[in-house]
Amino acid sequence: MSSFSESAILVRDALVARGLETPMKENGISREEKKERIEEHMREILSLLTLDLSDDSLEETPHRIAKMYVDEIFSGLDYANFPKITVIENKMNCDEMVRVNDITLTSTCEHHLVTIDGKATVAYIPREKIIGLSKINRIVRFFAQRPQVQERMTQQILVALQTLLGSDDVAITMEATHYCVKSRGVMDATSSTTTTALGGIFKRNPATRHEFLSGIR
């Protein structure tokens, strides 16, 4: 029996159908075994880098990294961690834009496994359903907690909300600093990357699109 919620399954299937799911293969390994095996491999990697793991500052580092990967920064790879979603019937007939600004996110670049640090703004036009505001933040965080490219992450959040709300009228914009650009390679400390995903009325109606984009701080 699946440990995934109905919402998690709906979102996952919608992403797979659109070719937007993060590339991953289920391996049937438990969380605890994953942590044990990652710790072993990380111990070998750090030793190859000539670090002395008998030093009291480093001896727990492989364990800490393994726990961080599975339980924290890559926890969004497991749909068992998909947030519990609350939607209610739109009995108040709200039909104006709902926008959540400045949602902080920290993700990890899937190419170099270094930090992506930024903010997202999410909006939707209520139709039949209204979603709990904190659930929007939690959905952003879920998709941030996996190796990512920003373009895909933006689209994943869009499709997740469209699926849960039963409406295409959703918009996302995201601005982030990529440490694969800032701390290595070109070493550009000031640039940021902006991505936008628009659905429904946000895509086809210039006035609605302008209202959304002009309201971003």
Curated annotation (Swiss-Prot):
NCBIfam families: folE (TIGR00063), PRK09347.1-1 (NF006824), PRK09347.1-2 (NF006825), PRK09347.1-3 (NF006826). It comes from Aliivibrio salmonicida (strain LFI1238) (Vibrio salmonicida (strain LFI1238)). It holds the Pfam family GTP_cyclohydroI. Zn(2+) binds at residues 109, 112, 180. GO terms for biological process: one-carbon metabolic process; tetrahydrobiopterin biosynthetic process; tetrahydrofolate biosynthetic process. GO terms for cellular component: cytoplasm. Its EC number is 3.5.4.16. The gene is folE. Homomer. HAMAP family: FolE (MF_00223). It catalyses: GTP + H2O = 7,8-dihydroneopterin 3'-triphosphate + formate + H(+). Pathway: Cofactor biosynthesis; 7,8-dihydroneopterin triphosphate biosynthesis; 7,8-dihydroneopterin triphosphate from GTP: step 1/1. This is GTP cyclohydrolase 1. Belongs to the GTP cyclohydrolase I family. InterPro entries: GTP-CH-I_C/QueF, GTP-CH-I_N, GTP_CycHdrlase_I, GTP_CycHdrlase_I_CS, GTP_CycHdrlase_I_dom. Keywords: GTP-binding, Hydrolase, Metal-binding, Nucleotide-binding, One-carbon metabolism, Zinc. GO terms for molecular function: GTP binding; GTP cyclohydrolase I activity; zinc ion binding. The keyword Hydrolase applies. The keyword Hydrolase applies.
